[in-house]
Amino acid sequence: MALFGSSGIRGVIGSGMTPELALKAGKALGLLHKKIVIGHDPRTSSHMIEDAMVAGMLCSGARVTRIGLVSTPTLAYAARNYDCGIMITASHNPPEYNGIKFWNPDGMAFSLKQQDELERLIESDIRGVGWEYIGSESHASNAILDHIDVILRNVEKCSLKVVVDCGCGAATTITPYVLREMGCKVISLNAQPDGFFPARDPEPIDENLSELKEAVKAFDADLGIAHDGDADRMMAVDDQGRLVTGDELLAYFCRFEVKDSVVCPVDASMVVDRCKPGVKVYRTRIGDAFVSEEVRKVNADFGGETSGTWIFPRISYCPDGIYAAAKLVELVSKNGRLSKAIADLPRYPLKRGGMKFSHGNKADIMGGIRAEIEQANSRINTLDGVRVEYPEGWVLIRPSGTEPKIRITAEAVDEGAAEKLYSQAESIVKRCIDSCAQ
């Protein structure tokens, strides 16, 4: 059974994620690395999972440093002084979930090769070292201050009014402090860590951010910032109290922060291709780890996913919602109202949907879709599903990772063209589903 998903090992406490699994993971990791730093988010199960993980690492003779309640980007930045870093978190998932994220010293998540090696060891029978070789444990308290320091060295002072919704997550330890040190007037919401996430669901999407949107208007703030449970994500609300979409925020960063090149996944809007002439756009599979890998490979200025993960390689290859918040505030201070800057971006109608199936499998269906599309089109990207480029727009057809469904996304220069591209893709998907069901 595959343990690793797109963001480490994750599951519901008591079933997909247990202390027993964390103990095995710790023993396996301790065989591969001997100097390890570990931190956690505020979930009710985080101490339990961390303790089990640490016990396993000590059992294999590792030297472990605990840095306590921190954000994921804080942990990933701290990992630069260790063989690797471990974050106990389930990020944007509901409170009953928890997980283990693995980070290299440069802020890159563990590669597929590293994951495979670790998974093989987890599934083996590791006895551990003798009593005289058991590892050691220590505590460090400077990780948050170090992260704050590197952020402040890479942004300029400004005096905006900012509302920050920490969501009762790990951002409570850092984002309000960073923005105040920058010179901002900060109004904090849900700034007490609470693993039950009583104020809102940890995922920073529109329906979960009503309080933030109202607060931005009520306090006449320049913008609002929202994080998920471990603060690797950052989303924003403009000065009118409207959530800035992930595609808009990606394009905003591209327009004002990127000089030469940007990396984004295949499902990102074509606005990123057209918002700043001369910028090279590289597209990857969906998932921040793939974006980070490509940022490093092509030496890009910036990478981002529309879910709210933003990668600034000058700091780290780990998505850093804290630095993203600070950088966004700096850019708004320099370039004027966020609502106007977003309104000035190109706009293209985008339609998302999909078709479920009860017979056949995703691989066969996608194989049929790819074969049919390849017969009629030459501009095809098959990194993640099938993306087809047209003069007026593009279509992406890809399998869902969680349900028997083929997802369809179409974007074009006008509504009619988007509807036409979507309908054409939908017809192809239906034919291939029907064919595989026979």
UniProtKB/Swiss-Prot annotation:
Q: Where is the active site?
A: 91 (phosphoserine intermediate)
Q: Name one GO biological process term.
A: carbohydrate metabolic process
Entry-annotated residues carrying Phosphoserine: 91
Among the GO molecular function terms of this UniProt record, one is: phosphoglucosamine mutase activity
Query: What is any Pfam family matched here?
Result: PGM_PMM_IV
User: Which protein are we looking at?
Assistant: Probable phosphoglucosamine mutase
Which SUPFAM superfamilies does the annotation name?
Answer: Phosphoglucomutase, C-terminal domain, Phosphoglucomutase, first 3 domains
Organism, by scientific name, is Methanocella arvoryzae (strain DSM 22066 / NBRC 105507 / MRE50)
Which EC numbers characterise this protein's activity in its record?
Answer: 5.4.2.10
Keywords, ordered alphabetically:
Isomerase, Magnesium, Metal-binding, Phosphoprotein
Q: Which family does it belong to?
A: Belongs to the phosphohexose mutase family.
InterPro entries registered for this protein in UniProt? A-D-PHexomutase_a/b/a-I, A-D-PHexomutase_a/b/a-I/II/III, A-D-PHexomutase_a/b/a-II, A-D-PHexomutase_a/b/a-III, A-D-PHexomutase_C, A-D-PHexomutase_C_sf, A-D-PHexomutase_CS, Alpha-D-phosphohexomutase_SF
What role is this protein assigned?
Answer: Catalyzes the conversion of glucosamine-6-phosphate to glucosamine-1-phosphate.
Q: Which HAMAP family match?
A: GlmM_A (MF_01554_A)
